[in-house]
Amino acid sequence: MPDHDSTALLSRQTKRRRVDIGVKRTVGTASAFFAKARATFFSAMNPQGSEQDVEYSVVQHADGEKSNVLRKLLKRANSYEDAMMPFPGATIISQLLKNNMNKNGGTEPSFQASGLSSTGSEVHQEDICSNSSRDSPPECLSPFGRPTMSQFDMDRLCDEHLRAKRARVENIIRGMSHSPSVALRGNENEREMAPQSVSPRESYRENKRKQKLPQQQQQSFQQLVSARKEQKREERRQLKQQLEDMQKQLRQLQEKFYQIYDSTDSENDEDGNLSEDSMRSEILDARAQDSVGRSDNEMCELDPGQFIDRARALIREQEMAENKPKREGNNKERDHGPNSLQPEGKHLAETLKQELNTAMSQVVDTVVKVFSAKPSRQVPQVFPPLQIPQARFAVNGENHNFHTANQRLQCFGDVIIPNPLDTFGNVQMASSTDQTEALPLVVRKNSSDQSASGPAAGGHHQPLHQSPLSATTGFTTSTFRHPFPLPLMAYPFQSPLGAPSGSFSGKDRASPESLDLTRDTTSLRTKMSSHHLSHHPCSPAHPPSTAEGLSLSLIKSECGDLQDMSEISPYSGSAMQEGLSPNHLKKAKLMFFYTRYPSSNMLKTYFSDVKFNRCITSQLIKWFSNFREFYYIQMEKYARQAINDGVTSTEELSITRDCELYRALNMHYNKANDFEVPERFLEVAQITLREFFNAIIAGKDVDPSWKKAIYKVICKLDSEVPEIFKSPNCLQELLHE
């Protein structure tokens, strides 16, 4: 019963203290706090010190002061616990021992000054209670009038909790001693001497929050990270060492390879059997031998340009084989030692020479057999062919006069761009319209028009020079394909719009009208011809034809429209042409007097003698665009000139056949002045001049697109083009009228 009363009294006092210092109340807090206080107090002192302290307190205050001593002990225990909160587990014992020494030395007021146990008001109340307890202790300690706890009961109660608390404290200290906090241990003295600025509640929460983060795990994580870094450094070092070793091995291999290559190269220079040209020739020879074994049907399917390429390579190899004995003789005379040519090399040279001669003859025979299977009638040549470089090839064994470097450069276009379909002697083109293996770009005219070109056959001329290849195999060369595009004005006016070439006088051919082609036309033809020569090295060549037909066929090939070629012929007066001529340009200029904005369908209708494609259509449209550009430039020029002259009204502006503007336009579109300009064109020109005048007067020329409004007005003023312009011979009819 006394034990129960003492426990209840201590529990109530503890609750009061917790309320005073602001600690939140929880269930079972009083008993747990009391047990913790007693265990902490007695664990800090050895048994001897504990008994001496208790005896000293009992002797000093006597039996009447037991409650006061117990209160002070509890107060000190509470202060011990509050003071130990901020410190780690490894320093709890040292702190308790230090507090015990301070107590024995009479430094008890330090606990009150620390502010850890209670506030000033609480200490004052306890002093009053302690003073009154000397007179009537039961009234102060036990409000219910119950007796106090005896010394024996207190010792027994403390001994019960001492062992359990001591074991727990030792276990905590043992677990936390593995990772001591150096920073907190260095600041112990500062925390003891200086008053704490935080409350015990905040200190307690901070301590619990720190305990939730085990330092042992942090240290192990740091150790793991450092171990991984060290492992990566080691791996990097090993990889670097392996790379250096591999580089050393690579350098050694390169040195060995260079030594072997140098020795092999020196042997090749001495023997002359493994040069680069010979290796290439062996590959070409193997391909040629494979092609010889094929059947005639397989040969017909191949591109004839391949045979010529192989033949040219074989000829070059034959030249090398012929020069080998000379080099061998020079080597023997120079060395007379073990570096001379071996018997195997001689045998290889002889065998190679024989195989080359055999392969060359077989290739030539195969080409002749394939392209002479269908005899045809040769088309008569109207324009004399150009000259051919001498001695293109030499096949027979007796003639070994090969090209020098300068001769090869002179016939660059003919060698690089071979003519695989040169006509053979006594071999003529097929008279039917059936397509052969290689479709020519310019096909002969229909049989119904043979009589029209009969008189022109007398103008056919044989080539001035004949190559050894032609003399050996019976070839007759056709028109030489020049490696560069022919000038546009180099060919005569063989179009159906003009007269025959024989009727053109020197004056007509050299007149400014005949040379009046725009820069777009010339550049277009030049670009097409160059593109054709660079992208079609093995394309079929033309039969004997005029230079005009050659140039036009190049444009046709560039445009990519190679269908229905049987309808195209530059020799017929009624057949379609492949390109535009100067007469077409003159016709377009005359049509500009009637229409300024022709459509593509109109162009196809009035240029019915031209085989239309994408290039032809765009060129005609470009012509009319240039016509309009010149037309509008002149109109703006004379409109500004009229404004400068003081003209203020459009009524003063008029165009007659005597005015300067009309003469400028007529000189550009009708240079020969052999065509009568229609009156409608004068009206349109006058309207255009006035539109420019009004726009400039109104200040609209500030806008960059101010001419668009004028263009919309002029495009509606086009008139019908006369039907005579649909005729291919419209220029002759118009000029004769």
UniProtKB/Swiss-Prot annotation:
GO terms for biological process: acinar cell differentiation; aorta smooth muscle tissue morphogenesis; atrial cardiac muscle tissue morphogenesis; blood vessel endothelial cell differentiation; brain development; branching involved in pancreas morphogenesis; cerebellar granule cell differentiation; circadian rhythm. GO terms for cellular component: chromatin; cytoplasm; cytosol; nucleoplasm; nucleus. Residues 103-149, 178-242, 320-344, 445-476 are annotated as: Disordered. SUPFAM superfamilies: Homeodomain-like. Its main location: nucleus. Residues 577-635 form the Prospero-type homeo domain. Residues 636-735 form the Prospero domain. One of its GO terms (molecular function) is DNA-binding transcription repressor activity, RNA polymerase II-specific. This is Prospero homeobox protein 1. It comes from Homo sapiens. The lineage of its organism: Eukaryota, Metazoa, Chordata, Craniata, Vertebrata.
